[in-house]
Amino acid sequence: MGTIKSGEIEKGSFLLFKGMPHIVLEREFSKMGRGGAIVRLKLKNLKNKSVVKETLKGADTVEEIEVLEVSSQYLYRDSENLIFMDLETYDQFNVNLREVPNIEDKVLFFQEAEVYSLVKWDNEVIDLKLPPKVAFEVVAAEAAVKGDTVTNAMKNVTLHTGLVVKAPLFINVGDKILVNSETKEYAERVKE
């Protein structure tokens, strides 16, 4: 997109920093008496998800980049790839599990025929976004012990994608539950 001065950087901007795409998480502008202005940034690398803090002088320039979010339908998974379909062109494409960082944490949340947001930079998928909560069907649940409710009793339940989470004792096989996609914890039962 072009270069911008450090004073023009906003929270949420996408920058090419040290050859890697980053998003600005925090920005703090300071004007030092005769020393000039400085900008403190907290940046998240979009490829490896590391977070770094950087300080730039007011006259420094950085390259702003364009990152696209594309809605695509998840079709299926083979041994090394997730297969998606572009909703505009109906073309199918692969996302290699080894090429997208931290994707293994998200794979068990993907459900066939659901639409997900893929983050692309330089025509390459660098992230897959999940909704905050995802609905699953319970396919296996440990038996609840009657009277075991002195504390907030939880049991392991297995969901139809293979994900195992802790859920309250009243959750049974066949129930649908919402799971927080960030914490991988039970959120609530889906009301039908």
Curated annotation (Swiss-Prot):
InterPro entries: Elong-fact-P_C, NA-bd_OB-fold, Rib_uL2_dom2, Transl_elong_fac_P/YeiP, Transl_elong_KOW-like, Transl_elong_P/YeiP_cen, Transl_elongation_fac_P, Translation_prot_SH3-like_sf. It is found in: Cytoplasm. This is Elongation factor P. The keyword Iron does not apply. GO terms for biological process: peptide biosynthetic process. Pathway: Protein biosynthesis; polypeptide chain elongation. Belongs to the elongation factor P family. Involved in peptide bond synthesis. Stimulates efficient translation and peptide-bond synthesis on native or reconstituted 70S ribosomes in vitro. Probably functions indirectly by altering the affinity of the ribosome for aminoacyl-tRNA, thus increasing their reactivity as acceptors for peptidyl transferase. Keywords: Cytoplasm, Elongation factor, Protein biosynthesis. One of its GO terms (cellular component) is cytoplasm. Transmembrane segments: none annotated. GO terms for molecular function: translation elongation factor activity. It comes from Borrelia hermsii (strain HS1 / DAH).
